């Protein structure tokens, strides 16, 4: 199988062909996802909660991300692999570059960082040095203490305009992908249509170019609170491989996420 690249996703956007992505943290699941046709995976700092058992993503280190990135890469050698730079790993452009180099050496194709216009210099520095960047706007879990919890972002004209401005600034700085998390569908549509780069949604309705889910949410094995945007595909299929195929099919057809998974 040919490796999936940024250009592959750009073509999906141009052809209006939705694509499914998922988080992965180990060899076995990465291989299973790749075998079933998921070509884009994220080693997310969500592993702090789903794998390590913390109550937020804040304790995750660059070494943690690099360890899991290497495992996922071995399981899915041809996937487009994104890796999060965790909390306080990109406070300055120089720090971002050093830490990005670590996760790229571990096997990532691209790093994901959370934040808006304040990251422009960092995004420029990374892309100029051959480190592709995926932005992340809306609900950015590393900022949970600023937001006062996990809440929908971008409601109201002023907040929506600010997020759109941030998205355009990140794209202009060189970001090649954008994740939009927990924003109203109407705003997600505005941003997706305004950007030339592909937009991946999670809790942003079915109007984005792609979707991502935390694998534990997709299989209903998350303890405690289940996000509104999550869907347990394993409950409907009774088989992990079938669940992955159904997730992909529903994303590609626009069935998932439905109205019940979306915010306004």
Curated annotation (Swiss-Prot):
Q: Tell me what reaction this enzyme catalyses.
A: 3-methyl-2-oxobutanoate + (6R)-5,10-methylene-5,6,7,8-tetrahydrofolate + H2O = 2-dehydropantoate + (6S)-5,6,7,8-tetrahydrofolate
Give me the Gene Ontology terms describing cellular component: cytoplasm
At which positions is 3-methyl-2-oxobutanoate bound?
A: 45-46, 84, 112
CDD domains in the record, alphabetically?
A: KPHMT-like
The positions flagged as active site in the entry are: 181 (proton acceptor)
Question: Which top-level group of life is the source organism from?
Answer: Bacteria
Pathway in which this enzyme or protein is active? Cofactor biosynthesis; (R)-pantothenate biosynthesis; (R)-pantoate from 3-methyl-2-oxobutanoate: step 1/2
Q: Give the required cofactors.
A: Mg(2+)
Chief location of this protein? cytoplasm
**InterPro entries referenced in this protein's UniProt entry, alphabetically:** Pantoate_hydroxy_MeTrfase, Pyrv/PenolPyrv_kinase-like_dom, Pyrv_kinase-like_dom_sf
Q: Where does Mg(2+) bind?
A: 45, 84, 114
Question: Gene3D superfamilies in the record, alphabetically?
Answer: Phosphoenolpyruvate-binding domains
Q: Which GO terms describe its molecular function?
A: 3-methyl-2-oxobutanoate hydroxymethyltransferase activity; magnesium ion binding
The protein's location, in the record's own words, is:
Cytoplasm
Query: What SUPFAM superfamilies would the database entry show?
Result: Phosphoenolpyruvate/pyruvate domain
Biological process terms in GO annotation: pantothenate biosynthetic process
EC number, as in UniProt: 2.1.2.11
> A Pfam family in this protein?
Pantoate_transf
Give the protein family. Answer: Belongs to the PanB family.
Q: How does it assemble?
A: Homodecamer; pentamer of dimers.
Function comment? Catalyzes the reversible reaction in which hydroxymethyl group from 5,10-methylenetetrahydrofolate is transferred onto alpha-ketoisovalerate to form ketopantoate.
Instruction: Quote the protein name from its UniProt record.
Output: 3-methyl-2-oxobutanoate hydroxymethyltransferase
Species of the source:
Escherichia coli O81 (strain ED1a)
Q: What does UniProt list as this organism's lineage? A: Bacteria, Pseudomonadati, Pseudomonadota, Gammaproteobacteria, Enterobacterales
Q: Which gene underlies this protein? A: panB
């Amino acid at each position: 199988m040919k490796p999936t690249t940024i250009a592959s996703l750009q073509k999906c956007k141009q052809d209006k062909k939705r694509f499914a992505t998922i988080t992965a943290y180990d060899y076995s699941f990465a291989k299973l996802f790749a075998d079933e046709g998921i070509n884009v995976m994220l080693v997310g700092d969500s592993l702090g909660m789903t794998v390590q058992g913390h109550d937020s993503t804040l304790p995750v280190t660059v070494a943690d991300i690099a360890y899991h990135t290497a495992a996922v890469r071995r399981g899915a050698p041809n996937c487009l692999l994104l890796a999060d730079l965790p909390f306080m790993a990109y406070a300055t452009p120089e720090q971002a570059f050093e830490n990005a180099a670590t996760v790229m050496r571990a096997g990532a194709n691209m790093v994901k960082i959370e934040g808006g216009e304040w990251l422009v210099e960092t995004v420029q520095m990374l892309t100029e040095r051959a480190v592709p960047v995926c932005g992340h706007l809306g609900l950015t879990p590393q900022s949970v203490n600023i937001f006062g919890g996990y809440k929908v972002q971008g409601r109201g004209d002023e907040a929506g305009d600010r997020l759109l401005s941030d998205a355009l600034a990140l794209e202009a700085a060189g970001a090649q992908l954008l994740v939009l998390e927990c924003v109203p569908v109407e705003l997600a549509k505005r941003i997706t249509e305004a950007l030339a780069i592909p937009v991946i949604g999670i809790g942003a309705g079915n109007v984005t170019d792609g979707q991502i889910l935390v694998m534990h949410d997709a299989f209903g094995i998350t303890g405690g609170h289940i996000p509104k945007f999550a869907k347990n595909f394993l409950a409907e299929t009774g088989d992990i491989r079938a669940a992955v195929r159904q997730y992909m099919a529903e994303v590609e057809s626009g069935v998932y996420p439905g109205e019940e998974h979306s915010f306004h």
